[in-house]
Amino acid sequence: MKASTLAAALLVLAAHVGSAEAGDPIKPTGTPPEPRFNRLYDTEAVGKFLADYARAYPRWVKLTTIGKSTEGRPMWLVTVNNPETGPELTKPAMYVDANTHANEVQGTETTLYLLNFMLTRYGKLERVTELLDRAVFYFVPVVNPDGRSKWFGQPATPHFPRTVATPRDDDRDGLVDEDGYDDLDGDGVITRMRKKVPLGEGRFRLDPKDPRMLVRVKRGERGDYKLLGWEGFDNDGDGKINEDPLGYVDPNRTFGYDFQPRYVQRGASDYPLQIPETRAIATWALTKPNLAAAQSFHNAGKMILRGPGSKHVPEYPRADIAVYDLISKEGERLLPGYKAMVIGKDLYRAHATTVDHLYMVHGAISFTNELYRAPTDLDGDGHAKPEERMKFNDLLTLGRQFVKWKKVKHPQYGEIEVGGYRHDVGRVPEGWLLESECHRNAAFVLYHARQLPKLSIARTRVRAQGKGLWRIDVSIANERAIPSMTAIARQNKLHRADLALVTGAKVIASGIVRDLDLDKIDLQRHRPERLLVPGVAGFRQQRLFFLVQGEGEVTLRYESLKGGLLESRIKLVEPSTRKEFK
């Protein structure tokens, strides 16, 4: 065998072996956790899982905190990065958070599922391997640890607690949080209250087919039951019940961008980023210039949401909307029954939300998924009727969801009944439905993350210009949908443009090639060796021009805050064979 042939064969073999090693599964150095994803976990259990992942994968997983909650609980931050392919800030980043609202719990399990899936599938699934090799992931699995702890540890409803634990005088009587829900029968769940009254004094009657349910009487009919709301009594003697529970500060209405006060939007804090939970996220995000995409998990309704959340937020640039549409439309296919929607246009007005803040301040393509919709529409007419919910309870959960009515003494109402659906019904799937929801939404995040900028030096061309001058044309390609600088980032100058640096020779001129055929170039006036590039659009190329004086070779370094780093050495020669620059 000729020496040249042998050398070539060895190079091919070395490249093959290196590729195999790079794709080897991650070998844990400790015992990795094995969570089951057909159940929910309280705050302490989630923290233990995260610590176990960090111990099992110490080179890949870093567990820190981004701050403390209102009551002093840690807000965990999980960073997943392949150290063999570079430091985290040199790669595009995907941010994922969950459980912003206390009662919207299963987003945390979805985040755990995604974390577990990536770590255990690296080296086994090509798409997972490629993604973890070129991107970094940041997870905040529990944005509201105080609220999660209360939802799991105290009597709750499907809708309460929702807020952070900031005391608030909701009824403006000078006291804070003094009249919340009360577990009248001591069963650990807040259900409904109903009272039998003399015929004609009520607006409801028992359903003749199922006395567990009440039906509203029609005009001319007389009822003998009243519905009295959630379990509770008049704690403060003001004649009202449950009017001032845990202070209503909605963390997803307290971010910095498009903040509006409480007289405009219920749930607002006194000023932007007042509460430690959202302030911690906003402050941390400022330290991550590589943040290019974001995903928040909420519930419920099966929706894939993006901003703008209100008319105060300008309409997103068309180029960015195209990226949003591409990702969300694929999401509708990955998530049967989910619908892509614009918050302020298709749903409701919402100010100072996570998605608007991360997009309008950081230029990150951001979604909120509203997880799950109870599959209780058994006849497929688009409406889940009370009798269908009860049938689902009886036949599919064998009665688990509905708490039977029980007589209790009420300090204001006298003898009443308490009963109804448990706090984990309606917004949260049963365990046998949870894992499927986790997987499909994790797959959506991975698809979203797959669209993070993937830059490469597609082509270079060197031509002698005489007298030691060389013209260098470089084409930077983006193989994915998200640009290395979103349109909103360019429009509002949210962060530094991409930077192309040439060293090793004197740079006489540089610029962006606008028309290759006509050789139209937008020249940069100052410091041509540091060419500012307004990003590379998704599935496009950006063509750069340099005129240098020197000999030997130069080094081209392309630095993109959202798209990572590229570096190439370019010889100042005109080779006899070179791919034509197009």
Each language-model region and where it sits:
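Bacterial N-terminal signal peptides that target proteins for export
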Residues: 1-7
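Bacterial N-terminal signal peptides
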Residues: 7-16
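Boundary at the C-terminal end of the N-terminal hydrophobic targeting segment
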Residues: 17-22
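Short glycine- and acidic-rich boundary segments immediately preceding or forming the N-terminal edge
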Residues: 23-74
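Metallocarboxypeptidase
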Residues: 62, 74, 138-140, 146, ...
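C-terminal beta-sandwich/jelly-roll accessory domains of carbohydrate-active enzymes
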Residues: 477-582
